[in-house]
């Protein structure tokens, strides 16, 4: 009986301060291990969502092309493309905090809203009077958001990725099934054929790296920046999310 009472007293005394501190320490260690894992998983989920959105943009542009036998560009972009080496045009370079050069020889800089209003059949901008989409077909189904900083298509009609970066979109405006992008055509970025690009001998080197696709879509990714003086496989460019890779 004495043994039983002693055992009961031991079971009922609760945790000591030292035991509580040990438990708290273990919880802290587990939390410190869990937070980075959750952060990494969240980042990967956003990257996956961005790739899905890029695929949606490319598909919408291709469907538009199939219907109209042209790309959904504004007249200003089409005119600028003629003067660009390679004859292509990059949307999405306007209003960026990171300097992304327009194509050499191009006199026009635009964000991707010009494409979005055409693809979504919105009666504004270059699509006023539905001039560029007379069938008023909604080719793109994307999330509309209030404001101009959230992921999705904002009130300015700019399409931003899950990291809140505007998508940069290059089109094969001369219909040769090869596309030059204002950023990725640069020798400093793509030398060696990084991201599956090749040097197009039809355009004089340097800065003649191109993709064998009619549409290139990309964004800055998690770090929200890119550097035209650094290679594509190093920071800050290595986390850029691209559609053609």
What does each model-identified segment do?
Residues 1-15:
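N-terminal leader/signal peptides at the extreme start of proteins
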Residues 8, 19-25, 63, 158:
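N-terminal hydrophobic or amphipathic segments with adjacent small-residue motifs
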Residues 12-41, 54:
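N-terminal single-pass transmembrane signal-anchor helix
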Residues 47-245:
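N-terminal pilin/flagellin-like segments and related low-complexity appendage regions
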């Amino acid at each position: 009986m004495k043994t039983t009472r002693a055992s009961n007293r031991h079971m009922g005394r609760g945790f000591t301060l030292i035991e509580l501190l040990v438990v708290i320490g273990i919880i802290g260690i587990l939390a410190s291990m869990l937070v980075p894992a959750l952060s990494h998983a969240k980042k990967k989920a956003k990257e996956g969502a961005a790739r899905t959105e890029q695929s949606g943009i490319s598909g919408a542009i291709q469907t538009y092309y199939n219907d109209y036998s042209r790309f959904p560009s504004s007249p200003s972009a089409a005119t600028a493309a003629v003067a660009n080496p390679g004859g292509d045009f990059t949307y999405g370079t306007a209003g960026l905090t990171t300097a992304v050069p327009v194509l050499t020889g191009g006199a026009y800089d635009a964000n991707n809203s010009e494409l979005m209003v055409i693809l979504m059949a919105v009666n504004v901008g270059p699509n006023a009077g539905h001039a560029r989409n007379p069938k008023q077909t909604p080719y793109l189904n994307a999330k509309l958001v209030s404001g101009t900083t959230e992921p999705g298509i904002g009130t300015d009609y700019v399409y931003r990725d899950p990291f809140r970066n505007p998508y940069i979109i290059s089109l094969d405006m001369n219909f040769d099934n090869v596309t030059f992008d204002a950023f990725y055509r640069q020798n400093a970025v793509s030398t060696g054929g990084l991201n599956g690009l090749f040097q197009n001998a039809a355009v004089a080197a340097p800065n003649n790296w191109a993709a064998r696709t009619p549409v290139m879509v990309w964004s800055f990714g998690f770090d929200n920046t890119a550097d035209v003086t650094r290679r594509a496989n190093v920071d800050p460019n290595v986390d850029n999310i691209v559609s053609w890779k």
